[in-house]
Swiss-Prot record:
Belongs to the class-V pyridoxal-phosphate-dependent aminotransferase family. SerC subfamily. It is found in: Cytoplasm. GO terms for molecular function: O-phospho-L-serine:2-oxoglutarate aminotransferase activity; pyridoxal phosphate binding. This is Phosphoserine aminotransferase. It comes from Methanosarcina acetivorans (strain ATCC 35395 / DSM 2834 / JCM 12185 / C2A).
């Protein structure tokens, strides 16, 4: 029978993700429109975004946090280009974004001493094979495969290389031991549902030491430069961005952080995300025609949750179009490079009740098109 209730918010995209519950553009009214980002009010707003981010995440005091251009991609690329090349590199690949980092390292930077450990969608490479005398590049959560690393136990505290982690669809949703990571990057538009185009970069003391002791053989464009006179440019991490940010997007980020504080902070964001995943775990358990793409529970993402459905590609497209036409779910098809299926965002800005409602619609649409 066709469901009668619909999700309050039909936005289940894996990026940009749903705005937080109760979101209103009224929350942006204190944006310093028309003011320079270098002005006192501009700098104060950017510094506030950095401080609230640091406090929310509970980062170590000696880690640096900065706002950088070009989303998570910009944040991660600037570290690949600024820090790699002085020792071997191990890259872990199990979905399209991690594959992109491997391509940049091998085809663009052309680093010869690179080992790529690759697994197919739904699986993880063998983490035991990683050599931490090398620099290690990986994503915490594979946004396009719904597969995450189970923990950070495989990363030694006494590593020689630096660990570079793209954590964009994991941070604010999963328990991440920061001391295991030297570079952490993410974007505003993922777990907290901010706006696009801005990245955030977190550096450990070991990452800073690398930046200050190593100069790459290749030229670096202005928006990749993190040092000045051989020292870390600390201004970047105090709100003096490399280039002009959107003060409107920054205000939106502040609004997301204030919402996150209002629901109880990081622990509650993680709890909300896990409860959202549990909705689908129950749904998959009672329906034999839908399956998680991730092969085991311990590597199953709680944010970008990916599914295989026992339908032909054409029928699956019909199911997705039907749900969009009914205005109950937008942007839930799998990523273009991934196996055909569904990808549904379960981060903290999505309400559990909306996912429960969506499950009813998916079941109805499946029976309609099969």
């Amino acid at each position: 029978m066709k469901p009668t209730r619909v999700p309050k918010n039909p936005c289940f995209s894996s990026g940009p993700c749903a705005k937080h519950p109760g979101y209103s553009v009224e929350e942006l009214k204190d944006t310093p429109f028309g003011r320079s980002h270098r002005s006192k009010p501009g700098k104060e707003k950017l510094a506030e975004a950095i401080k609230r981010t640091r406090d929310m995440l509970g980062l170590p005091d000696d880690y640096f946090v900065g706002i950088v251009p070009a989303s998570d991609t910009g944040a991660f690329e600037m570290c690949l280009w600024s820090m790699l090349g002085c020792r071997g590199v191990d890259v872990l690949v199990w979905e399209s974004f991690s594959k992109g980092w491997a391509t940049d390292i091998t085809k663009q930077l052309k680093l010869k001493d690179t080992r790529v450990f690759e697994a197919e969608y739904g699986k993880l490479p063998d983490l035991k094979k990683v050599d931490f005398k090398n620099d290690v590049v990986f994503v915490w959560n594979g946004t396009t495969s719904g597969v995450k690393v189970p923990n950070a136990d495989w990363i030694p505290d006494d590593r020689e290389g630096v660990t570079l982690c793209d954590a964009t669809s994991a941070i604010f949703a999963m328990d991440i031991p920061y001391h295991k990571l030297d570079v952490i990057t993410f974007s505003w538009q993922k777990v907290l549902g901010g706006e696009g185009a801005h990245g955030m970069l977190i550096l450990s003391p070991r990452a800073v030491q690398r930046l200050e002791s190593y100069t790459p053989a290749w030229p670096l464009p202005k928006i990749f430069r993190l040092t000045k006179g051989g020292k870390l440019n600390k201004d970047i991490f105090a709100g003096s961005t490399i280039n002009t940010p959107s003060m409107l997007a920054n205000e939106d980020w502040l609004a997301t952080l204030k919402w996150a504080e209002s629901v109880g902070g990081l622990k509650q964001l993680i709890r909300r995300t896990n409860e959202n995943l549990a909705v689908f775990e129950a749904f998959v358990a009672k329906n034999n025609w839908i399956h998680f793409l991730a092969e085991t529970k311990e590597i199953r993402s709680s944010t970008s949750v990916c599914f295989k459905v026992d339908l032909s590609d054409e029928k699956l497209k019909e199911l997705i179009k039907t749900l969009e036409k009914e205005k109950v779910a937008y942007d839930i098809g799998s990523y273009r490079d991934a196996p055909s299926g569904l990808r549904i965002w379960c981060g903290a800005t999505v309400e559990k009740e909306d996912l429960e409602c969506l499950c009813e619609w998916i079941e109805w649409a499946y029976n309609l098109v099969k």
